[in-house]
Amino acid sequence: MIDFKKKLNREVSKKHVNPIDLYSELDRSSTTGPLRPTQEKVLREWNDIHRGKRDLVVKLHTGEGKTLIGLLMLQSKLNEGEGPCVYICPNKFLADQVYYEAKKFGIKVSLITENNTFPNDFIDGNAILLTYVQKIFNGKTIFGLDNQYQKVNTIVMDDAHACLDAIKQAYT
């Protein structure tokens, strides 16, 4: 006979909400090192001061790790139960780069399927949806309009200037 009480009473491991703690627990490849001081500073300030705020801008120089910062913020939101979350890139090429970056760091991302549907991991708040501007801002958006839409809790827009230019082009 199986005693299911032992199985059901197991303590569920708590997911980290603090993005710095979260990073230390990721199943990342051995080629990745610790967070850079700038990344830690931005993540700490976001977590301690700006976490509940909307419409934030993170501005850093090229190569300072904005992609990882954005992914950690979104993963933190998912761990908090605040999904679904979307990471938007200005084009497909950069989305592919971010996909491999996320995999390298052990952050679960999902992609819109070939038949333009949302993956269940995204809908259930278990993975970050990684996409690019043209998939979202077009005349046939799969995110929906009116009463038929996909709820999204948090969005990170990588390289916002380039994304905004692509959005303008889509509607002119």
Residue ranges and their predicted role:
Residues 1-172:
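N-terminal helicase ATP-binding lobe
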